[in-house]
Amino acid sequence: MTELARRYYTAVVAPFDDAGRVDEEAYRRLMRYFLQERFRRVGGIIANPEAGEIYYLTREEKRRVVKIAVEEAGGKMPVFAGVFDLTTEGCVECARDAKAAGVDGLFLMPPAGSIDLVTMWNAAQYPEYWLDQIRAIDAAVNLPIIAHPAGGSPTAQWGLGVPGETARMICREVPNVIGWKMIYNYDGQRKMWKILRSLERPLAILAAGGGLFHEFLAHDVLDGTASGSWNYALEPMLDHIDAWRANDVVKARRIWVEGGLRDLHEFIYSDYSRLHLRYKIAAWLRGLIPNCKMRPPMPVAKAEEIETLRRLLKGAGLAREGE
């Protein structure tokens, strides 16, 4: 189970067609891109993550996306499925659908909806808000879990992520949790590294924002990833990681700085209200998906974002051929 967690999971975006439906053929093509030999050996798929707009998909659409991901992966790389519904019962049904489709594990995020559960949730004081739901899902399907702890009221200590003591409790009480996504602010991430390393069992630290991979690698805490950055910068990201793994810091820094990877990531992550849209814009500009449309009420791309990303992709050697 530890090896299952220590992979570079990509939070795959969901392409939509002109009518606003999930573009299944485009999704299959994107899956085949991720199945290229170099990534297949080390990577994994998260179908229906937050980046895949799971909050705005119907139950049948979620089923179809997972079914396609499992079909295309064909056992060559692991597939985890996002789970979301406004009710715990609905989340259990979603998890059962994913298990029936043959996924290797689940990608769980905190409850959403009421102000009680979202902006006002004190996760340190009331860990059961999420823990009870995780337990219900775990009891129903008994699959490995990657946690996406983006929930509750943001704090200066942790940023967007569920606080460290709550994370520790969840990991101790639910042995099926094998990986924890690092959705925290910089200081919070450093605290979480220590907390997760102090657990009685191995649990993978999964880097999220591509803009911090350099620090994760320097501290030797990049066990794996759960990141949407793979949607737009797979090749130089692998080069950068490989350089660090080979202890070639000079090469890693050259890829990161002179190679333009840092600047590309920094723009993508500079505005979290545009984050998942920018994943799609960049993937579209690279020719990996047919457009950058999101399902309303998600935002629409602005001309300046497109031009900035076009320039940054070119600077990172990722421009589409002919541009």
Briefly describe each language-model feature range:
Residues A5-T10, R40-I45, A69-E72, L106-P110, ...:
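Short amphipathic alpha-helical segments, especially helix-boundary/capping motifs
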Residues G43-G44, P78-G90, G113-L131, A147-A156, ...:
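Hydrophobic transmembrane alpha-helix bundles
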Residues R64, I68-A73, D97, A101, ...:
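Alpha-helical structural signal in soluble globular domains
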